[in-house]
């Protein structure tokens, strides 16, 4: 799966939305004290931004994401892998980047959740 998604992730990085570009400017280079990657492959998904150290994913949504069932499934799967997912509307990033960054900073300074004990994940073995 990763071999298929990696070229797509690179294409997405090269064709970022305005909101992604604005937020990346603030996240890159450890500007917030933590390293972020953009358009990163995690399992069968490509996430907009991820901080592996804090197990935090940031997703930016345009109008096409107005309560999408696939987004809910994706978030549940990412949560099951130990990631917290913050979602912001593109317009929020473009109009209130400081407010969005404040929410991200608050989350970055929370302690990491305790991972489930081995064998207690919600994904059944096949």
Model-derived regions, located:
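A short linear hydrophobic-aromatic micro-motif
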Residues: 35-38
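Basic, amphipathic alpha-helical patches used to engage nucleic acids or provide basic targeting signals
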Residues: 12, 16, 43-108
């Amino acid at each position: 799966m990763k071999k298929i998604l990696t070229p797509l992730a690179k294409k997405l990085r090269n064709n970022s939305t305005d909101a992604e570009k604005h937020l990346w400017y603030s996240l890159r280079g450890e500007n917030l004290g933590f390293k972020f990657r953009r358009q990163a492959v995690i399992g069968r998904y490509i996430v907009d931004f991820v901080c592996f150290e804090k197990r935090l994913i940031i997703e930016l949504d345009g109008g096409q994401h107005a309560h999408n069932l696939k987004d809910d499934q994706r978030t549940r799967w990412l949560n099951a892998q130990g990631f917290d997912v913050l979602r912001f509307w593109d317009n929020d990033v473009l109009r209130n980047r400081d407010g969005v960054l404040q929410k991200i900073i608050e989350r970055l300074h929370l302690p990491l959740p305790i991972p489930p004990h081995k064998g207690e994940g919600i994904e059944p073995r096949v």
